Curated annotation (Swiss-Prot):
Class of enzymatic activity (EC top level): transferase
Coiled-coil residues: none
Protein's name in the database: Acyl-[acyl-carrier-protein]--UDP-N-acetylglucosamine O-acyltransferase
PROSITE patterns: HEXAPEP_TRANSFERASES
Species this protein is from: Serratia proteamaculans (strain 568)
């Protein structure tokens, strides 16, 4: 179903069964598959392929040569009906690829709201990108990677399968991330190691002085005290009773399966 207020360029191909919302704009030489849903006000500039069981929300801007919802690159994939979901108000720049999930994973590759995916970013099968994230040019997420809200991934950075990047993290450019990066941390290098707290990012997002000091204290316990991880967790638990913002470290440790960068 194509809403009567949507614009479809004459050269675009919209397969029967696709849903195009009100005010959407499908530019020249785009292809939209039969199981695709595109929300209100979303713009496909030109030469874009959206395929498979893919749902795209409202007011997204998608630039030329992006490919969304295509078959993933997992060699075990056998055509299962896996999905891609993209939220609202994202900017997806030229030649970005976002692949559908796998039956062995969650079956879903998901991008949240208000993200910027710059040129040539790759989001592999079963990845989850949160809200208000920035993935710079040529950043590459392997399968099952999770990027939490407000994270920034530098250009030319590669992230290993199943890694988790915590909220408000900044990963420097040309890095290789092979383990999980706790919230609020700056990481860089190959393999990526911690380089302190993302103080500039936290200030921009309204963290107050007490919260920032608590985060710095937790960072020092984790990385500067020469404690084991279990010892650091115990000390951070005590700190979290006084400063709830530190609880985010503990919640992150509970999700980590690859170990954290040290």
């Amino acid at each position: 179903m194509i809403d009567k207020t949507a614009f479809i360029h004459p050269s675009a191909i919209i397969e029967e069964g696709a849903v195009i919302g009100a005010g959407a704009h499908i530019g020249p030489f785009c292809y939209v598959g039969s199981q695709v849903e595109i929300g209100e006000g979303t713009v496909l500039k030109s030469h874009i392929v959206v395929n498979g069981l893919t749902k795209i929300g409202r007011d997204n801007q998608i630039y030329q040569f992006a490919s969304i919802g295509e078959v993933n690159q997992d060699l075990k994939y056998a055509g299962e009906p896996t999905r891609v979901e993209i939220g609202d108000r994202n900017r997806i720049r030229e030649s970005v690829t976002i692949h559908r999930g796998t039956a062995q994973g969650t079956g879903l590759t998901k991008v949240g709201n208000d993200n910027l995916l710059m040129v040539n970013v790759h989001v592999a099968h079963d990845c989850v990108v949160g809200n208000s994230c920035i993935l710079a040019n040529n950043a590459t997420l392997a399968g099952h990677v999770e990027i939490d809200d407000h994270a920034i991934i530098g250009g030319m950075t590669a992230i290993h399968q199943f890694c988790i990047i915590g909220t408000h993290v900044m990963v420097g450019g040309c890095s290789g991330v092979a383990q999980d990066v706790p919230p609020f941390v700056i990481a860089q290098g190959n393999h990526a190691t911690p380089f302190g707290v993302n103080a500039v990012g936290l200030k921009r997002r309204g963290f107050d002085k007490d919260e920032m000091q608590a985060i710095r204290n937790a960072y020092k316990i984790l990385y500067r005290s020469e404690k084991t991880l279990d010892e650091a967790k115990t000390e951070i638990e005590a700190l979290a009773k006084e400063q709830p913002v530190v609880q985010q470290f503990l919640d992150f440790f509970g999700r980590s399966t690859r170990g954290i960068i040290r």
